[in-house]
Swiss-Prot record:
Pathway: Porphyrin-containing compound metabolism; heme O biosynthesis; heme O from protoheme: step 1/1. It comes from the Bacteria. This is Protoheme IX farnesyltransferase 2. It catalyses: heme b + (2E,6E)-farnesyl diphosphate + H2O = Fe(II)-heme o + diphosphate. Its EC number is 2.5.1.141. It comes from Bacillus cytotoxicus (strain DSM 22905 / CIP 110041 / 391-98 / NVH 391-98). Converts heme B (protoheme IX) to heme O by substitution of the vinyl group on carbon 2 of heme B porphyrin ring with a hydroxyethyl farnesyl side group. One of its GO terms (biological process) is heme O biosynthetic process. It is a multi-pass membrane protein. It is found in: Cell membrane. Belongs to the UbiA prenyltransferase family. Protoheme IX farnesyltransferase subfamily. InterPro entries: Protohaem_IX_farnesylTrfase, UbiA_prenyltransferase, UbiA_prenylTrfase_CS, UbiA_sf. The chain crosses the membrane at residues 32-52, 65-85, 106-128, 132-151, 158-178, 186-206, 251-271, 287-307.
Length: 307
């Protein structure tokens, strides 16, 4: 980029920056939306561990607090470090161009310090529950920051699969805070659901934002191999979710029916994509469905334990 182009970019960056408060900038820095959605899965893992071990939630409120806060801090710290790492390419993508690391509202040194501090605090909180919960939290952070953000994101189409490991550990953190041996199949079904769910979820997003990823040089599957292969991969991973509820019979027939209907709905919508001419519109529908799917599924897991 020559000097004149740099000046033009800097000038446009300043004029295009939306008005935001410090609180809004901080929430964007730690990706509060991701933190909130993953905190739900942490709580679900924690709640189900209580349920299947016959424990009273009121007697473990301290652990609940340490688990939720510790997990949220680790996720916020990891997301801050991801923003720090991606600050050189985020301006190339529409959905990330207004992040505070791009607009200059937060300096790189502050973002790095904040990320590390939040991670350390999160590990301390989780250590107040069990060592296993803290270890799983470390594995999730290491996978997201190092294996995904620093290594595979800009190098391999498998970056989505690698990143899905970090997104699958939150319910295991919640479970391990109560029952660190992790010897119950429900715990691992939670992990598998989260791991598999993320791949069609993020591939749909990659289709929707394919031009942005291409412009940023990120080798997402639709960028490298096109929409047809991506749609097939989305369908394969979505179908893989279908049998998992039947390994969670301990949650009862109501949950199994809800989960199966959600899976069938996603599969039907997925197959519709092979007949639909507007791939971008279909990818948006798949992305939105995946968000609703996860919320309904995990809330259902909690609700059915009351009956």
């Amino acid at each position: 980029m020559n000097h004149a182009t740099s000046e033009l970019h800097d000038e446009s960056a300043v004029t295009d920056v939306p008005e935001t408060t410090r609180v809004q900038d901080l929430l964007a820095l730690v990706k509060m939306g991701i933190v909130n959605s993953n905190t739900l899965t942490v709580f679900t893992g924690f709640w189900l561990a209580l349920h299947f071990n016959g424990l009273n939630a009121l007697e473990h409120l301290d652990k609940m607090f340490f688990t939720i806060v510790g997990s949220a801090l680790i996720m916020a710290g990891s997301c801050s470090l991801n923003n720090y790492i991606d600050r050189d390419i985020d301006h190339l993508m529409e959905r990330t161009k207004n992040r505070p690391t791009v607009t200059g509202k937060y300096k790189p040194g502050f973002v790095l310090t904040l990320g590390v501090t939040l991670l350390l605090l999160g590990f301390v909180f989780l250590l107040l529950t069990t060592a296993m919960a803290a270890l799983i939290g470390f594995i999730g952070a290491f996978t997201y920051v190092v294996l995904y953000s620093l290594w595979t994101k800009r190098a391999y189409t498998l970056n989505t699969v690698v990143g899905s490991v970090s997104g699958a550990v939150p319910p295991l953190i919640g479970w391990a805070a109560i029952h660190p041996s992790l010897d119950h199949p429900i715990a691992w079904m939670l992990f598998l659901i989260m791991f598999i769910w993320q791949i069609p979820h993020f591939l749909a997003l990659a289709m929707k934002r394919v031009d942005e990823y291409r412009n940023a040089g990120i080798p997402m599957l639709p960028v490298v191999h096109g929409f047809d292969i991506t749609k097939r991969q989305i369908m394969i991973w979505t179908v893989c979710l279908l049998p998992l509820p039947f390994y969670m019979s301990g949650l009862g027939i109501t949950f199994m029916i809800i989960a199966t209907l959600l899976n069938i709905g996603w599969i039907v919508l997925g197959f519709y994509g092979f007949r639909k001419k507007d791939d971008i519109k279909w990818s948006v529908q798949m992305f939105v469905y995946s968000l609703n799917y996860l919320t309904i599924l995990f809330v259902s897991m909690i609700v059915v334990t009351f009956f």
